[in-house]
Every structure is written in C-alpha cells, then in structure tokens.
UniProtKB/Swiss-Prot annotation:
Name of the protein: DNA-directed RNA polymerase subunit alpha
NCBIfam families, A to Z: PRK05182.1-2, PRK05182.2-5, rpoA
Pfam families the UniProt entry points to: RNA_pol_A_bac (PF01000), RNA_pol_A_CTD (PF03118), RNA_pol_L (PF01193)
TM segment ranges: none
Entry keyword set: DNA-directed RNA polymerase, Nucleotidyltransferase, Transcription, Transferase
GO molecular function: DNA binding; DNA-directed RNA polymerase activity; protein dimerization activity
Matches recorded under CDD domains: RNAP_alpha_NTD (cd06928)
Species for this entry: Nitratidesulfovibrio vulgaris (strain DSM 19637 / Miyazaki F) (Desulfovibrio vulgaris)
Region called Alpha C-terminal domain (alpha-CTD), residue ranges: 260-347
Amino acid sequence: MLIKQGDRLINTRNWSELVKPEQITRDSDPADAMYGKFVCEPLERGYGTTIGNALRRVLLSSLQGAAFVSVKVSGVQHEFTTIPGVLEDVTDIVLNLKQVRLAMDTDEPQFLELSVNKKGAVKAGDIKTNQHVMVLNPDLHIATLTEDLELTFEFEVRMGKGYVPADMHEGLSEEIGLIKLDSSFAPVRKVAYTVEQARVGQMTNYDKLIIEVWTDGSVTPEDAIAYSAKIIKDQISVFINFDERISGESSGNSSGSSDVNENLFKGIDELELSVRATNCLKSANITLVGELVQKSENEMLKTKNFGRKSLDEIKRVLCDMSLDFGMKVDGFEKKYQEWKRKQQNEA
C-alpha cells in the first residue's frame, strides 16, 4: 500500500507484509523470579539472531539496579588493612560486599547499617534494611569474627546501571574512612539465546528465537525482557523519518471527490470476522473500520479477551482493504457524516 505524505510516497508493505511473532511463550516455571526461558516465533529469516543479540546486549548492560557505592567500617581508615578479631582483611570484606544483591523501590540514595558484637559469621542478612531496600541473598558471607567485639558497617545504596568503578561515583564524601566501592548495578546476571527453524504453513525458512534470562531477583525475567525491548524501541525510533500513524488517505485506492478509502466507513459487522473478534471490538466501542484502524496493535492487545489470534485475523482483513492498524485519519467523524449524507442523497 502506497501512502502519500507531503511530497513523497510511503510504501507500508515494507513492514506490513513481514511475518510477525504470533506469540511469546514462557517455557519455564512462571513462579521462578530469577530464571525464565522464552520462545518467540515465527520471525523472518535472520531476525532471530538480530533480535536475540540486541536483547542480550541491552539486558546485560542497560537495566537499572541497586548496589552499594560506599562503606564505612568502625575503626578502619582504608581498605588495605586488617581488623583485630576479624578473620578476613578489609580487602576481602569489600570483595564480599560487592556480591550483595539488593532491590530498591526508590531513586533516592539509602543508608543502611550492620552492627555485630559477638563471635561468629557475619552475613548479608544481618544488614538492617528499611522499607525501601531488600537484601536478596541474605546467606552471603561477609566476614567472620574470631572473638566478641563491636563492629559497625555503614553503607550507601544507590540505583544505577551497568558497572561503575569506585572513582566514577558522583557526590561521595572524601572523608577519611569512607571506602568507595566498584558497583555492579546490573540485575541481569546471564543471558543466552538460540535460533531454530519455525514453520508457517508449509514454509520452514522462518526463525524461532529461544532466549534464557537469569536475574538476581530484583526484576523478573519477563520484565527484564520488556524493559530491554522498550529501550531498543526508543533508541531506534529516531531513524523513522515519517509519521508512523500512516494517513488513511490512499493514493492507490481512492474513490469520490475526497479521495478517501471508503472501506473506512464500513461497519464492523460487515467484515465477516469471527464472533470472538467481533464481540471484542464491540466491547471496546469500536463500530466502524475508520475507528479500528486508528488504534495501534498494542492498544488492541490491551482490550479484554482480545489476543494475538484475533489481531492477526483482523490484520488480514484490513490488508485486503489496503488498510492497517496505527493509521491517522484526520477528521474521520466529519468525513463519515459527509459520506452518509452522500449515500442518502444518491439513494
């Protein structure tokens, strides 16, 4: 379908005729908040690797997480020293602290404390958290006290992304005794993907993307993938140099003096859709094709009981009429009323 925008023609077939995934399914325990295996199919040949690699890189590098950025230990001036009565030296303790995984529900820095006074193991679960911060691996070993003594740790927790070296944190105090920490904010620990063949009808030259995601528990695998997809979408949208909500005025399928595709004025009942799809549209108060095409695919998928199968069914019907979702139809109601009057006059 060719659509005129300004002084140029936009060929919507560049994207409208590509096969799109019918569904994304989870092939792992949905109750597991730290591991997810997902299958996305069908994809155009080569798109499995393209999408899988892009998602993997963003998952590992760009998602927000929480981590310690500094620590103060009572009686300690710097990290290259030892603490009497503690088995580990301060350097080893700092390395252990970097492994503590945190979840935080605020962008504001938080300050936590850990105080011990008895001989024994000190673990991450001993950290006194608040309503904004949660320790995700409380069994992580931090230090071992070989005798009874009072020892206090003071931490600053921040949100961030990726890996930030200690000297790159902004706004930290330079006071003696404050130890700046290298921080790994990334909530995704590991990502792996494979690409297999998928079948569409009798054709087997399509891709099936299988992606596995391991997180630290501060974000679910589903949300991690969703955030990454959103990041990619936002970053590449700048390359689109035309109005994505393509106008419903067609250069190739026009009729009448207004050059409007008259299929826009058809009622939903005229499309011979399945009962399920028709009922979903009616429940969303969509009665005309012109109202339908102005909705995006994502908007439609949020409609109650409206799934990918109904979406694909409607897309095929719209395509036969040289229409698609996400079209811009300026002044549709006015055009519809003019068309109705014209039909009445001709009758």
